[in-house]
Amino acid sequence: EGKNNCILINDSYNSDLASLDIALDFLVRRSEKKGLKRTLILSDILETGQSTATLYRRVAQLIKSRGINKLIGVGAEISSCAARFEGTPERYFFPDTDALLRSGIFKTLHSEVILIKGSRVFNFDLVSEELELKVHETILEVNLGAMVANLNHYRSMLRHPETKMICMVKAAAYGAGSYEIAKTLQEHHVDYLAVAVADEGSELRKAGITSSIIIMDPELTSFKTMFDYKLEPEVYNFHLLDALIKAAEKEGITNFPIHVKLDTGMHRLGFSVDEIPLLIRRLKSQNAVIPRSVFSHFVGSDSAQFDFFTRQQIELFEKGSQELQEAFSHKILRHICNTAGIERFPGAQFDMVRLGIGLYGVSPIDNSIINNVSTLKTTILQIRDVPGEDTVGYSRMGHLTRPSRIAAIPIGYADGLNRHLGRGNAYCLVNGKKAPYVGNICMDVCMIDVTDIDCREGDKAVIFGDDLPITTLSDKLGTIPYEVLTSISNRVKRVYYQD
């Protein structure tokens, strides 16, 4: 977050045409969502092998094509090509970073999304620091590049290139933020997005997402929303099917796509296989809805101990889905593989697979991290020396055994930090070292022991991330990474970047 209602995108560590192209797309995406003007702060692009004239002619084309409102160029080369940027409404050029910082131009930036893009030698960290709104905050950093790497990791496991991919973005994309995740997945041509309820789907549509969207848990009151926003519901029993048909007929809708769920052993939702003949007759008796896919849900595809049962599920699904397919002349897609199934049961990939937790960096097979996507971090608010005989926190639960340095950080159970992690049961990282939680975790704040850590107020504390896997927290809590990710509250700011 920047000063004067600005949003900053800091990509000040490298600069080349390819990364500029990607970063400009990111800038456009953020400005469209927020309705703000687009500003680019760009340094000379070094060591490209192109002539200065050729290079900056291409840069000018990229900037113009993205509708950049304001360009701030820094460096001798880009300044010498100022005339090439006439297609940008506002243009300012400075010979070096010091001149930019002295100019006072930052005071004129209001309600803009600002992309800071520069080569390392220009020290644009100083620019970012000058523009950044200085607040104590807890943020969830989401690495979109890592997420795409995870997507491609699982795509590489597909036996056939024509196998389609459904990506799960329900529960705010497992806590990462549904719009940015959905937008990135759409750009990488996934075939379907899946959310839990119609409201999640309609919000994505309003934000400009055009990909096909499946509603996994449709409610009887949400049919109008699904019709209006072209959201395709899962249908799992006759009560829901009949109500949906009636609502579609009332609206004069025909051939509205649905996704038929079969119960092959989860015993949560779905038609039983012996109901399929009746289901076929019901579907053929009307033209309001049409089955787009038929699917089921593995119970334990992540564990070898359930392999016999998983194979039984596959066999039952093959039987039931084939019966449904043969009753219709159009192609009905089949899918049963989740993240673990993609890897462990490639023979069951059928026409489509569903990618969930693996997209967000966690392998459900062994809880290992593929490419870490989310990092939860916060800032030390205060450090105090506490005598060894004192206690820390509510109910005096933080018992000290020595004189200690205790730091307060602005994250609590209202942010999604589980209370069971307190009282020394877990730790965060401060400057790369373990800082145990002391006493009870409070609603908005918790305390950590930094006695043996060289740190000061304002330093960062990492709750989970690259060096402290989220699975460490979930293991401490005796739960799964899904729960930890989806527990991060909406008041925690999401910050997106591409590595």
Stretch-by-stretch model annotation:
Residues 139-143, 148-149, 162-335, 349:
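Active-site-proximal beta-alpha core segment in soluble small-molecule metabolic enzymes
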Residues 1-66, 148-166:
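Nucleotide phosphate-binding/pyrophosphate-handling subdomain across enzymes
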Residues 2, 115, 429-430:
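A general beta-strand register signal
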Residues 11, 44, 71, 116, ...:
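Residue-level signal for inorganic ion chemistry
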